[in-house]
């Protein structure tokens, strides 16, 4: 019984370590959770971020416009 319990504990610890490693990789993945949007006076497409007050850092956004409680961010 003790060996089986110890084996379960080892497997559980290994699962936690691998899950934490996957979360660290996912944090740095270049994945945007934005949809397409257009602002008045802009010809190209922007990224619509839902229920955000400002554009997120790290995507190179330079201009923006507000669409209700959402924000449309434009790179470069």
Swiss-Prot record:
One GO cellular component, as annotated: nematocyst
A GO molecular function held by the record: toxin activity
Keyword Transmembrane: no
Tissue expression: Weakly expressed in the ectodermal tissue from the distal and proximal tentacles, body wall, and oral disk.
Any Pfam family hit: Defensin_4
Coiled coil spans: none
Main location: secreted
Annotated propeptide span(s): 20-31
Family named by the database record: Belongs to the sea anemone type 3 (BDS) potassium channel toxin family.
Function description: Blocks Kv3 voltage-gated potassium channels. Reduces blood pressure.
Protein name per its UniProtKB record: Kappa-actitoxin-Avd4m
